[in-house]
Design a protein with these regions (language model features):
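Short, well-structured N-terminal submotif of metal-dependent ribonuclease cores
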Residues: 1-37, 51-58, 134-141
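Alpha-helix capping/helix-boundary segments
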Residues: 6, 41, 79, 99-100, ...
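Short, flexible helix/strand-to-coil boundary loops that buttress conserved ligand/catalytic motifs
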Residues: 11, 49, 123-126
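Active-site-proximal, substrate-binding regions of enzyme catalytic domains
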Residues: 22, 44-71
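Structured helix-beta-strand junction loops
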Residues: 30-32, 69, 89
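Active-site neighborhoods of divalent-metal-dependent phosphate/nucleic-acid chemistry enzymes
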Residues: 71-113
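Acidic, PIN/NYN-like endoribonuclease modules and their adjacent C-terminal/linker elements
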Residues: 101-102, 106-142
Length: 142
């Protein structure tokens, strides 16, 4: 499961995560990395891009590209219920990330690709840092 930050860093300005996140996006486009994402990721991505001054046409084109190269999951009631539980149990987790974690867990997806340490410590969910080349390579090989 992708976290929004992978795409924000990949398409954003200079940052230590920019190159690893761009490489991940390339692997997704090439079909080497099966990308799972929440429909909420598209919303968050477009909102953040527009808020950072990217014109809407570009933000829409970028969001469509992500949607086209990811398997999108809608938010179901069970996801909301589980997200609320996760959010109450993990103080470091914000609510949108709790939704992403719940969606992953409810779909037996046990990995989230994210630099955000807020996902650490969630039972049944392993966070893989985009800058961890070996861990990312293991996803491609899987």
């Amino acid at each position: 499961m992708f976290d929004t930050s992978v795409f924000i860093y990949a398409l954003g300005g200079e940052h230590p995560y920019r190159a690893p996140c761009r490489a991940i996006m390339s692997k997704g486009v090439e079909g080497l990395l099966a990308g799972e994402a929440s429909i909420e990721l598209i919303h968050e991505f477009a909102h953040v891009r527009a808020r950072r001054g990217v014109d809407r046409r570009t933000a829409v084109a970028d969001a469509r590209h992500i949607a086209d190269t990811s398997r999108l999951h809608t938010v179901e009631r069970a996801d909301v219920e589980r997200a609320l539980e996760l959010w109450s149990e993990h103080e470091q987790l914000d609510m949108r990330d709790a939704i992403f974690a719940a969606q992953a867990l409810n779909r037996q997806i046990n990995v989230i690709l994210s630099p955000d340490r807020g996902f650490d410590g969630i039972e049944g969910l392993q966070r893989i840092d985009p800058a961890d080349d070996d861990a990312v390579a293991s996803l491609i090989a899987a």
